[in-house]
Structures are given as C-alpha cells and as structure tokens.
Amino acid sequence: MNKGNDDLSKLVAQIEHINELAYIQYKPIAYDLCGRIASIDEVEHILDRMLDFCGCDEILKLFKQICKHYYEIYPEMIAYEINSYREFWDNE
C-alpha cells in the first residue's frame, strides 16, 4: 500500500471515530428532546449542530426522529432544517 492510500485510510478511520463520538453525545440529547416539548431555539440549536454529522447513518436517524417529533410544533423551522440537510448532504 502506498503512502497516499495509507493517509487516506487513516483519515477515514478518524472521521469514523469522530462520528462514533458524535453519536454517543447526540443519542441521549435526541431521546431527551423527543421525550418532551423543547423550545424552538433549543431544537434548532441541536439540529444545526447535528447537521455536520448527518453523513453518518446513525446520526441521520436521530436527526430525522427529532424532525418528525417537532414537525407539527415548529413546521417552518423543521422545514428549514430539512432543506439545510438536503443542500449540505444530498448529491442529486
């Protein structure tokens, strides 16, 4: 294996590790938010931060759970967050 592939493999491993850490941090937060009615500012803040990690399937599932829970409560904000996700992560 050449140095370029080695460096790329290390980078991928680091990103996967960061995603794992983010999931560990966001999972209880997502469960907490879905178990109550939080303020629009709190939900928006968490979704904005989670957006950076939505390339990770597990975090994307948490993001979607929060969006589903709050869609009827804060429809405009949730629509904005979903559109932000699409702009950032959708490749089509």
Located regions from the model:
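Amphipathic alpha-helical interaction modules
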Residues: 13-61
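Amphipathic alpha-helix face/heptad-repeat signature
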Residues: 11-18, 81, 85
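Amphipathic alpha-helical binding modules
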Residues: 58-92
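Short, charged, low-complexity amphipathic alpha-helix
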Residues: 1-10
